[in-house]
Amino acid sequence: PLALAPSEVYDDFQKGGCFSGSAIEHDGKLYLVYTGTTNYGDGFIQSQCLAYSEDGVHFEKYENNPIIPHPPEGYDESNFRDPKVWKHGDYFYLVCGSKKNNLASALLYRSKDLKNWEFFNVLAESRGEFGYMWECPDFYEIGDKHVLMFSPMGINERTSVYLVGDMNYDTGKFTYTNVGQIDYGFD
């Protein structure tokens, strides 16, 4: 069966849709966090939404979607997408791509219950060298380091970038010291 399809005002099929996201298990349920996209004629509006499943096959959209209706002030709501969710300590964290003043950002949110989210900090941002938008960000730990990986828009086509550094969960800030490309696109 189809797990997720556009059906609501916040992920309207005719003018937007369900964009990518991620999943996490919590209390015996599988939770999907995804981007709902709609367009009422004046550009895309993107928000972060939640669906859940008891069996991992049949999903129900959360009745109070969107769980994050807008990015923080000054960020582009038509470029606010692709949430990655994980748990650390007592909080769930979510990173999604956005942009402000034509520079890419990875925005960090946190929640105690996956339903009520607060903006925590800008996890990392471009200073101009990594394009104007970061799509499909991923954030994970390897050993004692953290990695932020994304697909930048506005630089070399078909490139994926990774940043390696240290995460401070008290401040919500990621400080990277190493940068690299995952691949160089198609041959």
Segments predicted by a language model, with ranges:
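Beta-rich carbohydrate-recognition and catalytic domains
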Residues: 1-82, 86-130, 134, 141-186
